[in-house]
A protein has these predicted regions:
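Active-site-proximal beta-strand elements of phosphoester/diester hydrolases
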Residues: 1-2, 27
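Short, small-residue-biased leader/transition segments that mark boundaries at the very start
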Residues: 3-8
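Short, compositionally biased P/S/T/A/G/V-rich stretches that sit at domain boundaries
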Residues: 12-14, 19-51
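Long, low-complexity serine/threonine/glycine- and acidic-rich segments characteristic of extracellular
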Residues: 40-54, 58, 62-144
Length: 144
């Protein structure tokens, strides 16, 4: 059997908005508002990029931009990589013995981005711009 990828993205749906000849669409996570388009993880959360902050941008395509700021300074675009979503990996690691189907588990996803902060106590802001020009922002304060 093939392993079934577990991804936060599975808990949502696409929303399409039509205005005359213009079409806008976005991913809607169940239980979250429209602006919740990505998850941001602190340094150390990702087993693939332990030295980096990681963003999982669920509906990403090549027209999107993923920028980051450290202490208010524009650091440019984050680097895309393939890896495990930290929350899904941790969930599977802790709970796999209780799964009814043993082929369920964390799988590699290709909509992850990373950036390595210069200092351990930085304020990090990530700005994601989608294909329609909508900007989504998340902030976190790194701890020492």
């Amino acid at each position: 059997r093939r392993q079934r990828q577990m991804c936060i993205r599975d808990s949502g749906y696409a929303v399409y908005e039509f205005d005359g000849g213009k079409v806008n669409w976005y991913y809607k996570c169940v239980g979250k508002d429209k602006d919740y388009q990505f998850e941001l993880y602190p340094v150390g959360a990702s087993r693939n990029k332990k030295e980096a902050v990681v963003a999982n941008v669920w509906n990403y395509d090549s027209t999107w931009k993923v920028k980051w700021y450290e202490n208010g300074i524009d650091k440019g675009e984050m680097t895309r990589f393939s890896g495990y979503d930290p929350a899904i990996y941790e969930y599977c690691e802790k709970n796999s013995s209780t799964f009814k189907h043993k082929y369920l588990g964390a799988d590699i996803t290709e909509h992850l981005f990373y950036a390595v902060p210069e200092t351990k106590d930085s304020e990090i802001r990530v700005e994601v711009t989608d294909h329609c020009g909508n900007v989504y922002t998340r902030k976190m304060q790194q701890s020492k």
